Amino acid sequence: MCGAHFVAIALLVAAGCQTAAEFDQDDIQQTSKDDSMASIDLLQSRNLRESRDSKDDLLSAGDEERTPPFPSGVLKEPKVADSTMAAANVMRTEGEASAIKAASKNLNQLKSNKPQRIAPASRSVAGQVLHSSPDSDKSLVSVENEQLLVLAKRRRTKHPTAMMTNAVRSAEQHDYRLAPTESSTLPAQASDGQLSKQLITQKVLQLDKKKHVDESLWREELMTVDEVLHLLETFDKPAHPTAVNVHEANAIGIATKKLNYLRRNKRKRIAPTSNNVVGQVPHAQPDPDKSPVLVAKDIPSVLAKRLRTDHPTAIMENAARFVTQHNYRLAPTGPSTIIAATPNSQLKYHLPGQKALHLDKNEHAGDLKSLRNEESHTIEHILHLRERNDKSAHTTAENHQSVPEDWNTVSAKGPKLLSKDSINEKVKKVHAAFVEAFNLPFHQYPEETAMMLKLVQRKTKSSPNNGETYDAFMYMAELQQHSSHLRKLLGPDLKMLLGTDKTVLPIKLENLQEAYNVKLVIMYDLFFEFCHDRKDLVEGLPRKPKPNQWILKLST
């Protein structure tokens, strides 16, 4: 009887398991289309439900009674059918394939929506088929709007720097299209109206007027159609893979800048060069704006301090005025390098050019203009102009003095000296070099050179500002006791020191001695500079002091 009960219970349990399996299979087939993962969950839940240990399945029979355990041989773990597992695997594979297919479809759709370049359409201008230029407002390369922030973030800075700003501005304004490789698309037969539209669209608007083009192009130059076409042809010939706007902007800017520079400087004086003219090599003239000697501004006060007077005297003022206006460059010693026998063809091309180099534009501007605009000048007139220019090349028509030919005759007219201050060969050599180096403001006697050479060769107290130097000059002036002799000594320089016309000072011994003393003080400044500059000629000199007050010194 007990065995029959156990058999009935086993049959009921088996029937329930089969019904549950059929229900689960129908449920999986119904939900596989929505989500393949749901079938796996159902299988797992069913396996868990059927594989639970029978020891844990207790049937409640009240608080005290419990059902007896099932025999281990009756309730076994049910096996899942192979057909059920195969169906689940197929459904899972189909779900994954559907997801992959949908993702691929979305990716292809995104790729198909990217901006594509439109091929340029052909159009006809003035009877010719032309290809339209790429849109000047659309670049082949996109530029990020937030470049500044991106650069700052990458460089780990809080704010964009000026260099970043310039780089971003350049990247935004750069034209990434290749320059044209064939000739210009604008025909010469195009009408003015069409040219205006074409040129403005293709060329002018591509230029950055504020940053890449000289503003004089927009302010002064008005270009004709022919000039624009010529520029376009010039730009097309050397074209290479470089931005069009940069190439054209540089070319226009450079050409305009050169043109304006030539217009502004058409009357500027050009430094002469040494050219071979009619078999002779003329040397370039010294710069007329540069003197070999620098002149101090406070000469009267320096003279008053050195000569120990309370204030500058009239002689000191006259001497300072003349020294300031004097030209220290040597006047030309030879005749003009142009020979009258030069052929007319050479004179036609060489003389106007050489005249333009030598004419003083302040004094001979009319002559220069006539040489440019008129062709009726004769050879005699041009040679006359050249001769007049040679004479007026310097403020002093001729050199103040030259090297003496007869030293004994010159010494007899010179100032009185002490017996130890004799004129030897060394003095003659230094004196000749000093006279030939400058156009001296005052006449220099060999006796004066002998005394100054002795002073400059002192180991100490040789500076022009030294008190013993003043005493030596004053003593030499006092040796000249006769006014008639002093007047002869100062003969060439008397007007520069005592004045002229109504301002001339009385010619008396006191004024003559002061004038001679002033002359020696000024000349020693220049002689001191000359000796220290020519140490190959004057040897054994001490170290040159740096005077805080000076009258004349060399500019080199």
UniProtKB/Swiss-Prot annotation:
Q: Where is the composition biased (Basic and acidic residues)?
A: 47-67
- Subcellular localization, as worded in the UniProt entry: Secreted; Host cell
Region (Disordered) location: 43-76, 108-138, 389-408
What are the alphabetically sorted keywords of the record? Secreted, Signal, Virulence
* N-terminal signal peptide: 1-19
Protein's UniProt keywords contain Mitochondrion = no
Q: Where is this motif: RxLR-dEER?
A: 46-66
Question: Membrane-spanning regions, if any?
Answer: none
Q: Transmembrane helix among the record's keywords?
A: no
The entry's cellular-component GO terms read: extracellular region; host cell
Sequence similarity? Belongs to the RxLR effector family.
What domain comment accompanies this record? The RxLR-dEER motif acts to carry the protein into the host cell cytoplasm through binding to cell surface phosphatidylinositol-3-phosphate.
What is this protein's name?
A: Secreted RxLR effector protein 114
The species this protein belongs to is Plasmopara viticola
